[in-house]
Amino acid sequence: MAIKSYKPYTPSRRYMTGLSSEDITAKPSVRSLLVKLPATGGRNNNGRITSRHKEAGAKKLYRIIDFKRRKFGIEGKVEAIEYDPNRNCRIALIAYKDGEKRYIIRPNGLNVGDVIASIDEGSLDIKPGNAMKLRFIPVGTIVHNVELKPGKGAQIARSAGGYAQLMGKEEKYVILRMPSGEMRQVLAECMASIGVVGNEDWANITIGKAGRNRYRGIRPQTRGSAMNPVDHPHGGGEGKKNSGRHPVTPWGKPTKGAKTRRKKASDKLIISRRKGK
C-alpha cells in the first residue's frame, strides 16, 4: 500500500505522511455490524484515571469482527474492503451464500470478488483468507488471526503486517513462531487464517503533528523529570538535573529493561523466548 505525503501549507504538515485509500471500496458500512462503544477516557467507574495518556479521541463506531471464523462449509465472497477506525489494518466485508454478512481482518492479496471459506475437518487451498484448524495447515505456512484456545477467537497476529509461521507439529500441539520471534506450542485444534495481515506500511507513516494523535485518543506524555517530587520519583532538582537513580514508574517500580511479564501456567508451552532470549 502506497504512502502519501501532504502539501505543506502548515509547518506541521511538511513531514506528515499517510496511507493511500485506493484499496478502499466506495460503499457505506453495514449498519447491523456497527455498535457504539462507551469512551472511558482512561477512567474507571469512579472517574479516576486508571490508564494514563488516554482520551476519547474522534467519534467512531466499533465494527464487529469475526475473529472465530467458525462458519464452516459455506463459501463467502469479498464484497468490499473497508477502513476501520478502531485498528491499523483494513477489514473485508464477506457475503456468505446463506445471506449472512461478516467482517474479517483483511490479509494481503485478498481483493473484492475473491471467494474464501472456513472448514472444520480437512484442509482448504492455501490462499489468503481461508481459515482452518492448525493441524491441517502445512508446515512452513504463514498464518494470522491465530487462536490460543479453541473457540475463543483469534488473539495472535491481528495487527497490520502481523503474521506467525507454523514451524512443526507434535501430537496435539503445533509449534508457531510468533510475531515477536518467540517459539511456542499451540493446540492443534485452534483456528488460524492463511496469509499476512495487510496494510503493512502502516508502521512507516509519520504522525507529523500532535493533533493527529489526539484524534486517535492519545494524550501528551509529561516526562517525570519535568514534574515536582510529589508527582514523580524523578521530579525536582534545580534546572535540568538527572534523577540520580535507575528509571522508575510514577509508583516507584523499575522500568526501561525491567521484566513486566507475569508468570502463567501456559509459560510451559514457550519453547524459546523472543529474539533468542
Swiss-Prot record:
InterPro entries: NA-bd_OB-fold, Rib_uL2_dom2, Ribosomal_uL2, Ribosomal_uL2_bac/org-type, Ribosomal_uL2_C, Ribosomal_uL2_CS, Ribosomal_uL2_dom3, Ribosomal_uL2_RNA-bd_dom. SUPFAM superfamilies: Nucleic acid-binding proteins, Translation proteins SH3-like domain. GO terms for cellular component: large ribosomal subunit. It comes from the Bacteria. Residues 231-241 have a biased composition (Basic and acidic residues). Keywords: Ribonucleoprotein, Ribosomal protein, RNA-binding, rRNA-binding. PROSITE patterns: RIBOSOMAL_L2. The keyword tRNA processing does not apply. Pfam families: Ribosomal_L2, Ribosomal_L2_C. Residues 219-277 are annotated as: Disordered. Residues 256-277 have a biased composition (Basic residues). GO terms for biological process: cytoplasmic translation. One of the primary rRNA binding proteins. Required for association of the 30S and 50S subunits to form the 70S ribosome, for tRNA binding and peptide bond formation. It has been suggested to have peptidyltransferase activity; this is somewhat controversial. Makes several contacts with the 16S rRNA in the 70S ribosome. NCBIfam families: rplB_bact. Belongs to the universal ribosomal protein uL2 family. Part of the 50S ribosomal subunit. Forms a bridge to the 30S subunit in the 70S ribosome. This is Large ribosomal subunit protein uL2. It comes from Campylobacter concisus (strain 13826).
